[in-house]
Each structure stands twice: as structure tokens, then as C-alpha cells.
């Protein structure tokens, strides 16, 4: 009887502390977000052809409540069992240079989604949208809505060399 109670307690602790996570990694960008009817959040990731050789610096976990710098985007989300959302803020030094704000406060609610645009000239991607920040707002009915900051990234004359911090993480690395 005691072992059954322990197993039930362990199961309750596991379920109560569960989280849902979704991430793009350091080679992809978040171009969309979906809020399911049950409140679960997913981000949609892509690697546009004009961004194939570009890298962002992302932390190991989503622990931030906001991605507040103009050189960061949301590289992942963790949704806790209480509904709270944590963000993985990836830093990309060239973001302020090559992007403009497309939408400052685009709101999506339960059952809705946002999917960014890709601008094309023939077969070449010239610009794409990405999520720079997600602000979680608790509505009066207890559900959450999300305000998105959307950047339009203009591929233009982007340098093909990875940033210096990325090169230092590659093995072997020697100072010149």
C-alpha cells in the first residue's frame, strides 16, 4: 500500500512539474507561432536560403521572460505546466544592421497562428520575417494571448563569414 502511495505521489509530482519545449537551434530562425486550442504554444522554424551560412548564439535553455535587445530573436520556448512561457533568446550581431521592424505588437490568441512572409525575386529569397520577441499576456478569462515583435530581415549584402564568437567555439581554434 505504501509503495502504491509513493508511486502515485511521484506521478503527481512529475505531471505537475512537466513542461513543453520547442526550439529552432542556432542555424534556423523562428518565422511563425501557433497557439493551440488547449493553450500549447509551438514556434515554426526555417532556414531561408539567404541565411544558410549564418549562425546565432543561443543559450542552452529557455529561461528569459523577454528578448529585449535589438540583436536577438526567439530561438525557442518552454511552456511550464502553469502556462508561463520562457524564451530562448538567440543573439545575432547583424540583426540590427539588416532588419527593420515589420510589426511591433502583433497579437495572437488561443486557436490562432502567425506565419511570416518570405520575399522572393525569382528563386532568390531577398527578405524574410522572424520573431524577435514574445510577450505573454494573461487575459481576464485566464487564458493567455501573445504579442509578437516581428522583424523583416533583408538579405542584401550579408557577409558570408561567420561571426568571430562562432569561430572561437570551433575546434581546434588558435589565436592568430
UniProtKB/Swiss-Prot annotation:
Q: Please give the biological process terms from Gene Ontology that the record holds.
A: cell communication
Q: Which residues are glycosylated?
A: 70
Membrane spanning stretches: none
Q: Which GO terms describe its molecular function?
A: signaling receptor binding
- Tissue spec. comment: Expressed in seam cells, excretory cell, reproductive system, pharynx, pharyngeal-intestinal valve cells, neurons and neuronal support cells.
Sorted keywords for this record are:
Developmental protein, Glycoprotein, Secreted, Signal
Disrupted-gene phenotype: Worms either die at embryonic or larval stages (43%), or exhibit variable abnormal morphology.
**Family annotation (InterPro entries):** Dev_Signal_Hedgehog-like
Q: What is this protein called?
A: Warthog protein 5
Amino acid at each position: 500500500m505504501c509503495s502504491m502511495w509513493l508511486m502515485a505521489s511521484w506521478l503527481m509530482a512529475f505531471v505537475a512539474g512537466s513542461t513543453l519545449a520547442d526550439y529552432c537551434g542556432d542555424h534556423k530562425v523562428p518565422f511563425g507561432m501557433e497557439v493551440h486550442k488547449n493553450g500549447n504554444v509551438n514556434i515554426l522554424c526555417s532556414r531561408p536560403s539567404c541565411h544558410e551560412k549564418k549562425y546565432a548564439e543561443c543559450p542552452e535553455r529557455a529561461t528569459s521572460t523577454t528578448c529585449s535587445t535589438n540583436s536577438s530573436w526567439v530561438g525557442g520556448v518552454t511552456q511550464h505546466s502553469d502556462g508561463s512561457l520562457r524564451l530562448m533568446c538567440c543573439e545575432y550581431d547583424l540583426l540590427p544592421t539588416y532588419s527593420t521592424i515589420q510589426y511591433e505588437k502583433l497579437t495572437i490568441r488561443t486557436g490562432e497562428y502567425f506565419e511570416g512572409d518570405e520575399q522572393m525575386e525569382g528563386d532568390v529569397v531577398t527578405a524574410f520575417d522572424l520573431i524577435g520577441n514574445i510577450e505573454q499576456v494573461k487575459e481576464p478569462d485566464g487564458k493567455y494571448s501573445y504579442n509578437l515583435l516581428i522583424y523583416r530581415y533583408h538579405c542584401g549584402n550579408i557577409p558570408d563569414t561567420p561571426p568571430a564568437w562562432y569561430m572561437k567555439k570551433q575546434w581546434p581554434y588558435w589565436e592568430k
